[in-house]
Amino acid sequence: MKRLCIARGVFALVTGLLLQGAAVTGHAQSTEIKTEYLMTYMAPLDAPYPIDSSLLIVNVKPTGGWAKGPRISGTFIQPGGDWLRVMPSGALRLDVRATLKTDDGALIYISYNGIIQHSAESAEKMNKGELLTTKDIPYFITAPTFETSSPKYAWLNSVQAINKVVELKLGEGGYVKYDVFIVR
């Protein structure tokens, strides 16, 4: 009983301090998330290689990928890859690694994870190699981070971004295109 009273007292103290801090700073917990457009990028894809019933590997082709935005522009170079894990729910969990060479020669490593949830219709279209757009896929969000030694792009080392799929096509002429936003 004594431990329960102490635990309640500690909880009340911590809660009071948190509420007092919010009142002093004028910053209550906010659920608003702001984003800033960073770039659009496109990466050409090979057909997936099924490793087993739950793992697909998609090779990012060595040429043809690009990134364009107000503060950054370049092309994707090797190495790059896209691992897709099929979850028991049917959702796909992504693990992607890519290298961007900017137009001024800087190298930026991009790594992201995310989730794709297909509807029966979007899965069928994807399996047929048809073009899918944002409106076709119920949920396709990834969260990239960046690493670079370039002083010009060092600010990327300190931001979290989100990708929203724009287009996806598998099979012949396959590619993925994202709009990328910095989370503020």
Predicted regions and their residues:
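N-terminal secretory signal peptides that target proteins for export/translocation
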Residues: 1-7
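Bacterial N-terminal signal peptides
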Residues: 9-22
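Sec/Tat signal peptide C-region and signal peptidase I cleavage site
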Residues: 22-28
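Beta-strand-enriched cores of mature, soluble protein domains
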Residues: 28-184
